Amino acid sequence: MPDHANDGYSVNACIVRRFEEGDAKRWDAFVAATPQATFFHLAAWRSIIEGLHHRCHYLYAERQGVVTGILPLAEIHSWLFGHALISTPFCVYGGVVAADPESEACLVQAAAALADELRVDYLELRNREPRQTDWPIKHLYVTFRKSLPSEGIDDLKAIPMKRRNKIRKGINASLETRHDGSVAEFYRVYTESVRNLGTPVLPRRWFERLRRAFGTDCEITMITLQGRPLATVMSFYFRDEVHTYYAGSVRSGRTVAANDFMYWAVMQRALERGVRLFDFGRSKQDTGSYDFKEQWGFQPEPLPYAYHLVRAKEVPNVSPTNRKYHLFIEGWKRLPLPVSRALGPFLARNLG
């Protein structure tokens, strides 16, 4: 998609345009009016991603001046995963959202043309539902989503027995919950948690920008014991959904089941806010987090991420289970926390 196409170009009677600063309200109005759009399609993600020095290529389709489809895209240069055009990096969902098949087709065509022009290794569309069935599909991830019952959360009756017993352990330990945590509190716990998993952490300013951009729809829950933080989660609220997105805990929290207690607390909080759908987030198959979410009574739903290969010869294997990343992950787990906090942001900003 050439740079001079800012004024728009026609594909199959649609006009595809590049997002400009004045388009945010139109873009978000389309998101609000389109059921298949997700929290990660909101326009605010563009400036947040650009805050990590990535170039965004947000596209939208219109017909007779009316927005009929959107496609958020960002270009990532990763020392691990190569040069990619992704919808949407740092987000679990993305891809085209369109009012009609023609608008979807012209946005996909425009994205593929842009990927070819940029000479990326590949274009990745993080679809939540099957799309682009003629493209290579990778089912590395699943998501876990479920409607919360109107009764049985507070008294644990709606919680599966194994998780219920864990929550009672937290209750008996007198764990406390706050839903007004600060980014500073969150970051101290979260950085330790992801270091223990062997993952570089995003910079603190990333989470600060999320809070500023989404306000009360971005909430930090803190679980403490006698004032000492044990677990935390940054959740996103969108329509009638809550996404528990960035979560972590310290090792000492395991003895009192702080993680289980925390997710139970967020379920209670969601119902207080009138939200009924709980999004537990994505997990890789055959992992501990996958099993954990199933034990809460959630069923896995495959995430059919679609790929258009440009310079790459095959769909990339970006799974941490890839032997190629094993030494890095194991080494990162052993880093002193101050070192992982200092180095992590320089690496994580390019992982996407």
Short names for language-model regions:
Residues 2-11, 75, 129-154, 276, ...:
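Active-site/acyl-donor-binding loops of N-acyltransferases
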Residues 12-64, 71-81, 127-255:
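A conserved beta-strand-loop-helix scaffold within acyl/acetyltransferase catalytic domains
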Residues 54-56, 117-120, 273-275:
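Short, high-confidence coil segments that cap the C-terminus of an alpha-helix
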Residues 60-68, 75, 80, 91, ...:
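Aromatic (often tryptophan-rich) hydrophobic motifs at membrane interfaces
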Residues 87-95, 139-146:
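Acyl/amide activation-and-transfer machinery of modular secondary-metabolite enzymes
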Residues 88, 157-166, 319-326:
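Short intrinsically disordered coil segments
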Residues 102-145:
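Non-catalytic accessory segments adjacent to catalytic cores
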